């Protein structure tokens, strides 16, 4: 099955071919949501046989299961109860895996600015956690979301449904809005790897940066920078298929052992072993996301320069 995606220039923006009975789709949100929502995705599998899928560490994701069997999630080595129909997957610094039994999972990526506009809660409380979505959002909104997505005739109809429901949600005004948006851009900037440099760019102290990072990004600023640096490097290895290509890793890594220590933190294993675990959804999503949304993984998503 070949899921068509809007092509963008770049080595990762390649045609996405899925095995028979599986499909993947990415969509950009309404431009008014662009700073809050990093993108929409839908993964579908017809078979009801158990399937294990692995995904890279990422910012907050809202997930809604449609016509799905039991979904058993794990973050790193921690297992969670079966996911309810609508869940919030908090910001992660460990790999996320799920054992599914067919159906569709609709994902809504939430940026740090989106988190600040959606809720007054601290994102660090959800670090490496999965909770029912109605414990964070108004249950009536969650019910409406589930009902509308269930009624959508096909995957192409998901975007307008999501836009309509999500637009009214991001209304909270946060006093740190400008710092959050600046931090979103700086974290994913190639070459940015030091907390001191990041704080200086923002014009704030390292302690203030740490508090902002924990509250809105869900983890300390040092860990946030390490995650972005590691994923920039790992994605290059993943796409090339060569897990030992030292020329692909970020130059701020002292050597390959330094990179492998980060791999153990963010993948729980070596790049080679994780790549052997890669399933069709992860392999396709790296290219499909780059083609449609401009970045191969949510944690490297650059925010829009201007807000309409």
Residues of each region from the PLM?
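Basic, alpha-helical helix-turn-helix
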Residues: 210, 214, 218-229, 260, ...
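Alpha-helical bundle regulatory/interaction domains
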Residues: 1-181, 186-206, 219-220, 235-238, ...
């Amino acid at each position: 099955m070949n899921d068509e995606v809007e092509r963008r220039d770049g080595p990762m923006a390649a045609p996405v071919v899925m095995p028979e009975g599986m499909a993947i789709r990415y969509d950009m949100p309404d431009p008014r949501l662009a700073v809050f929502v990093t993108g929409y995705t839908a993964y579908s599998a017809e078979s009801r046989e158990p399937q294990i899928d692995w995904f890279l560490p990422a910012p907050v994701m809202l997930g809604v299961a449609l016509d799905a069997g039991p979904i058993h999630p794990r973050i790193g080595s921690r297992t969670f109860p079966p996911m309810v129909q609508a869940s919030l997957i908090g910001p992660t610094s460990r790999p996320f895996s799920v054992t599914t039994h067919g159906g569709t999972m609709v994902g809504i990526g939430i940026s740090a600015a989106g988190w600040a506009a959606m809720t007054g809660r601290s994102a660090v409380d959800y670090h490496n956690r999965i909770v029912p979505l109605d414990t964070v959002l108004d249950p009536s909104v969650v019910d409406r979301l589930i009902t509308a997505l269930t009624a959508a005739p096909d995957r192409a109809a998901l975007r307008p449904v999501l836009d309509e429901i999500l637009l009214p949600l991001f209304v909270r005004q946060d006093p740190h809005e400008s710092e959050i948006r600046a931090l979103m851009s700086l974290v994913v900037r190639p070459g940015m790897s030091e907390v001191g440099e990041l704080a200086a760019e923002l014009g704030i102290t390292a302690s203030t940066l740490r508090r902002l990072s924990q509250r809105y990004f869900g983890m300390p600023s040092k860990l946030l920078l390490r995650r972005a640096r590691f994923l920039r490097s790992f994605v290059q290895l993943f796409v090339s298929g060569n897990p030992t290509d030292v020329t692909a890793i970020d130059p701020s890594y002292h050597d390959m052992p330094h990179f492998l220590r980060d791999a153990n933190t963010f993948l729980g294993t070596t790049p080679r072993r994780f790549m052997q675990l890669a399933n069709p959804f992860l392999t396709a999503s790296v290219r499909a996301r780059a083609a449609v949304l401009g970045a191969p993984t949510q944690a490297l998503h650059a925010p829009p320069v201007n807000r309409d």
